[in-house]
């Protein structure tokens, strides 16, 4: 029967009545759209049966069959062709069913066939299935187009094989989406002898039973993309991509493809010379999952591209002749013991090992500026290595001892090695790069301490072992520190300077490593001649941070420390008639510059501190004597700079603190007559501290100081005239200080503990001053003083259990010069300049100004 022989025709089976079910049986050939336009509608349970059927028979014809609703069926015992030479459309929906022995979409040149299978329960059942027939004329334009759309839960069941793009110059396309399913019992050919594509998205399902092929002939260009969460392709046997032609398989955005079983399945790329087979794991977003045992590359151009922005595990083994690229910004973690030949290029993101042997020992690796090769703490062997990016040795859990062996040559294109080292002595556990060939170029090394406490070294801790010519330059990026010690990178061991390797040493020699000018000659073995001359032990190199910690401790102990006259000036200026006050308030400011000498004979320490302190007091007359009792508070800040005299590295210390205290002073006499005094004070200080070493993180911690002082003096007149008297006042003072500090764990991992710094300091001195007797106001009372401070505060810092002392000189000698001034009724001021000096180049210069008002 022919529908649409020359003019438009319509056959409607089923109508619109509920439960109606027109039936039509045709034992011959059914043609819809022979030379004109024809259409068949099968709905509402209508049934159609035929032996053979063609939709869109001749050139220029248009045929269409629409079958919908549950119970509607079309049965073809032999073949069903949609688009023979013309244009054909078959639309199956809403639970309808169609079956055919053989099914073809776009059978010949000029044909165009479209199949749509839509809806839950909608089924197309076929034997052999073909999409895109085409022509045997190799010079013809691309024609013979077929397209199948399966979505919304629709199902296509193919008991035979399925061929997409089966004849030259044809084009076959399949789209499976939103829960659509295509089940193929035998082989799926995508691009059998022409162009074909399959796209599975949004939870679509594709199943094939026997080995499947993508680009199965030299004329074929074909691709399969499985994309989106829930989208899968399950192949029971194996998949061949680009066996003879140009084929690509893309798995992305959470999709999954299985090729055989994870134990013995495989995916084959590029079967013969001249073919191209590409596996794309991702297209820049999320990756997909490939479940198979191996990805094999054969004789042609086989490539695997990892182009994703997420973290993804890849478990199949990569083997054979393959070129591998890591493109996207994400991380690929490998669990196969890969042995492929060909290049590995990491252009972006991270190429990471999940097991030992994950990186192919037969592949030359190229790490571009945006890429990272991550050993994850697992030993690896590779071919040659060109590093313009990052090679990371440690695992996420830390630790050290990972080795990367480069069987060929190594070239550093300004790249970086991230290495963990348990920084200690020569035998410290360390990550290591072993190059069996030659080295060239420039490479930076960043070292992270893996729990080492620091130690003196002799030969050094080897990081790079070079078997060939060692013309490459390795530079330490940042710093390598542990405990008290600083490590630097040197070429050659201390006793084997020409061995070509690179070593970390804590060595105080102020000689920088020398850049090599050419290949180094390996040392000759000993010949039993003259005995070796013993080499003296290496002096370890101290880092400057201990000086900053000690400087902060010293600043905290000394910031608010002083004498009674430092604090309130000359009380006698308040005691003349007309100036006597019951109450008083005062303020003083002090600035000091302290050089505490070299710590460990390597680190110079300088501290600048500024203080403002104020107080209020009340006077009590007790018999012939008087007592001043008051409160005081203060704020101060200090900056310390520790500079290594060997490495010139610096560490900055900062202290800012607040102080509160009480004091009481007893004077033997109420008047200005000379006599004795006793001063007692207690003080509590609290400090915020910072230490910031060059190229290290900023450390913060708190500290506290409690101190008490008792001081006594007696003024004796030594000469007098009608206008002036001169007095000498011997003095003695005892100060107790108790320093406490939080522990610090630095970003480098070093544990820092500051000593308590408690102890007694004594002062013995004398003050010589003159006093005007004219009775005029605005008197000036100059003075000079000398003091001997003894005992001092024992400063100490322990870093990873190793202590470094910063004890001040036991004897410090001080000289002062200044004056007190009477400014007016109740007002007085004082100023002074002081200099302290002790052993170990200790120097302290300070000056202060004070102002007091009594009423």
Regions found by a protein language model. Give the residues of each.
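Extracellular beta-solenoid/beta-roll
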Residues: 289-290, 299, 307, 313, ...
């Amino acid at each position: 029967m022919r529908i649409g022989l020359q003019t438009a025709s319509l056959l409607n089976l089923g109508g619109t009545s509920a439960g109606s079910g027109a039936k039509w049986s045709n034992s011959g050939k059914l043609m819809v759209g022979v030379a004109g336009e024809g259409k068949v509608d099968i709905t509402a349970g209508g049934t159609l049966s035929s032996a053979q059927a063609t939709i869109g028979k001749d050139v220029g014809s248009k045929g269409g069959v629409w079958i919908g609703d549950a119970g509607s069926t079309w049965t073809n015992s032999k073949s069903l062709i949609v688009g023979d030479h013309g244009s054909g459309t078959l639309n199956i929906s809403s639970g309808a069913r169609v079956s055919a022995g053989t099914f073809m979409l776009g059978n010949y040149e000029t044909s165009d066939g479209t199949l749509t299978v839509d809806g839950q329960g909608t089924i197309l059942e076929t034997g052999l299935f073909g999409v895109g027939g085409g022509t045997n004329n190799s010079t013809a334009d691309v024609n013979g187009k077929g397209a199948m759309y399966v979505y919304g839960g629709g199902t296509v069941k193919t008991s035979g094989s399925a061929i997409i793009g089966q004849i030259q110059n044809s084009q076959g396309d399949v789209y499976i989406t939103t829960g659509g399913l295509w089940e193929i019992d035998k082989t799926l050919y995508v691009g059998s002898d022409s162009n074909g594509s399959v796209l599975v998205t949004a939870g679509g399902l594709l199943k094939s039973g026997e080995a499947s092929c993508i680009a199965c002939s030299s004329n074929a260009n074909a691709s399969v993309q499985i994309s989106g969460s829930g989208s899968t392709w399950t192949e029971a046997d194996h998949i061949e991509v680009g066996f003879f032609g140009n084929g690509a398989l893309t798995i992305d955005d959470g999709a999954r493809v299985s090729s055989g079983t994870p134990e013995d399945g495989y995916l084959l790329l590029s079967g013969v010379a001249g073919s191209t087979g590409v596996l794309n794991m991702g297209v820049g977003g999320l990756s997909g999952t490939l479940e198979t045992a191996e990805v094999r590359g054969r004789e042609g151009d086989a490539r695997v591209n990892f182009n994703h922005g997420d973290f993804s595990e890849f478990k199949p083994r990569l083997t054979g002749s393959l070129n591998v690229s890591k493109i996207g910004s994400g991380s690929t973690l490998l669990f196969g013991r890969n042995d492929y030949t060909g290049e590995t290029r990491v252009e972006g993101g991270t190429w990471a090992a999940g097991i030992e042997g994950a990186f192919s020992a037969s592949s030359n690796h190229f790490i571009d500026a945006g890429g990272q090769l991550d050993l994850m703490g697992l030993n690896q062997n590779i071919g040659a290595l060109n590093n313009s990016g990052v090679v990371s040795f440690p695992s996420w859990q830390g630790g050290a001892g990972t080795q990367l062996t480069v069987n060929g040559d190594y070239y550093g294109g300004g790249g970086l090695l991230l290495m963990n080292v348990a920084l200690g002595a020569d035998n410290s556990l360390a990550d290591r790069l072993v190059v069996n060939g030659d080295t060239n170029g420039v490479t930076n090394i960043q070292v992270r301490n893996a729990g080492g406490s620091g130690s003196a070294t002799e030969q050094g801790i080897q990081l790079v072992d070079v078997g060939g010519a060692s013309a490459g330059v390795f530079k330490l990026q940042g710093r390598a520190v542990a405990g008290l010690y600083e490590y630097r990178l040197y070429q050659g061991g201390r006793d084997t300077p020409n061995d070509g390797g690179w070593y970390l040493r804590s060595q105080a020699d102020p000689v920088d490593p020398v850049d090599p000018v050419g290949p180094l000659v390996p040392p000759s073995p000993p010949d039993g001649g003259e005995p070796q001359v013993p080499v003296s032990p290496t002096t370890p190199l101290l880092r400057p941070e201990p000086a900053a910690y000690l400087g902060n401790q010293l600043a905290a102990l000394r910031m608010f420390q002083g004498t009674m006259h430092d604090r309130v000036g000359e009380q006698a200026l308040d005691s003349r008639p007309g100036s006597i006050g019951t109450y008083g308030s005062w303020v003083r400011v002090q600035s000091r510059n302290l050089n505490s000498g070299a710590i460990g004979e390597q680190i110079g320490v300088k501290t600048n501190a500024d203080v403002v302190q104020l107080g209020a007091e009340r006077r009590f007359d007790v018999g012939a004597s008087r007592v001043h009792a008051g409160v005081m508070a203060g704020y101060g800040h200090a900056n310390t700079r520790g500079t290594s005299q060997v490495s010139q590295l610096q560490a900055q210390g900062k202290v800012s603190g607040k102080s509160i205290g009480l004091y009481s002073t007893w004077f033997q006499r109420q008047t200005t007559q000379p006599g004795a005094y006793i001063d007692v004070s207690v003080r509590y200080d609290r400090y915020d501290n910072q230490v910031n070493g060059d190229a290290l993180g900023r450390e913060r911690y708190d500290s506290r100081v409690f101190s008490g002082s008792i001081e006594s003096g007696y003024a004796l007149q030594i000469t007098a005239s009608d206008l002036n008297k001169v007095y000498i006042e011997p003095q003695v003072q005892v100060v107790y200080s108790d320093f406490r500090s939080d522990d610090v764990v630095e970003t480098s991992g070093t544990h820092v503990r500051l000593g308590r710094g408690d102890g007694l300091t004594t002062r013995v001195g004398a003050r010589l001053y003159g006093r005007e007797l004219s009775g005029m106001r605005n008197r000036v009372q100059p003075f000079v003083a000398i003091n001997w401070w003894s005992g001092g505060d024992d400063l100490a810092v322990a870093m990873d259990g190793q202590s470094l002392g910063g004890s001040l000189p036991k004897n410090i000698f001080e000289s002062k010069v200044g004056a007190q001034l009477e400014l007016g009724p109740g007002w007085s001021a004082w100023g002074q300049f002081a200099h302290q000096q002790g052993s170990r180049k200790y120097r302290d210069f300070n000056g202060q100004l004070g102002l007091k008002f009594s009423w």
